[in-house]
Regions:
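Metal-dependent nuclease catalytic cores that hydrolyze phosphodiester bonds in DNA/RNA
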Residues: 1-131, 220
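Nucleic-acid nuclease catalytic cores
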Residues: 97, 121-220
Length: 220
């Protein structure tokens, strides 16, 4: 509808002043044992590198790394969004620390030859009151699919990405999706998403229970 107003704040998307919980916020309820290990490792490495750090400085190390990863992700996603009208990327103008990820994306694009239809689209599920931003809707082999890009050192793909795309596919009425993990080494993983909307809804129920007071205040 032309008169709809969409905003995003505090872990929610707002459509005509009504809150829709973000998909990524819901998925935070899922325990991530590997993330706890990574957090401890980052603190250990920071102290090993600089034994003079105090506790607060050492505990801040993982957050600095996370901020760098977010900046990297934003750069790569912006590049992907602009690749459709301008497929001739000058690799020499890409910051050195991002070149591997860009190489991985270019390889993937050449291998699968997608036709991008929409990028960075906000999607809403009115029945279940959630929303999110999908990376790309595209045609691959003549079939409409959703694609989510992830950047990491080794291009790994984690379970939460499957649930994220399960939610997006349900909102968009799409039956197939892919996760593309872009690695720092210039390689990629192209994985078909295992769509299971029921599991996403189960996570959402838990999230709603844990945040029930906040939801009541917001009139969710």
């Amino acid at each position: 509808m032309a008169n709809e107003t969409k905003k995003r704040r505090a872990g929610y998307y707002w459509l005509n002043e009504k809150p829709y919980v973000s998909v990524t916020n819901v998925l935070k309820v899922i325990d991530k044992a590997a993330l706890r290990y990574w957090f401890g490792q980052q603190v250990f490495l920071a102290v090993a590198k600089d034994p003079g750090l105090n506790m607060r400085e050492a505990l801040a190390a993982p957050y600095r790394t996370t901020k760098k990863a977010a900046t990297r992700g934003s750069f790569i996603h912006n590049l992907i969004e602009n690749y459709k009208p301008n497929p001739n990327i000058d690799i020499n103008n890409v910051p050195e620390e991002y070149k591997g990820y860009v190489d991985a994306f270019v390889k993937w694009h050449k291998d699968f030859n997608p036709k991008f239809l929409e990028c960075e689209k906000s999607v809403f599920n009115h029945e279940h009151k959630y929303a999110g931003t999908l990376d790309v809707k595209a045609l691959i082999g003549g079939r409409k699919v959703l694609i989510d890009f992830k950047t990491s050192k080794d291009g790994a793909v984690y379970d939460e990405a499957h649930l994220q795309l399960s939610a997006y596919c349900e909102a968009e009425g799409t039956k197939k999706a892919f996760i593309v993990g872009l690695g720092e080494n210039g390689n990629y993983q192209h994985v078909e998403a295992q769509l299971n909307f029921d599991v996403f809804l189960a996570a959402k129920k838990i999230w709603e229970f844990k945040n029930r007071k906040q939801l009541e205040t917001l009139g969710y």
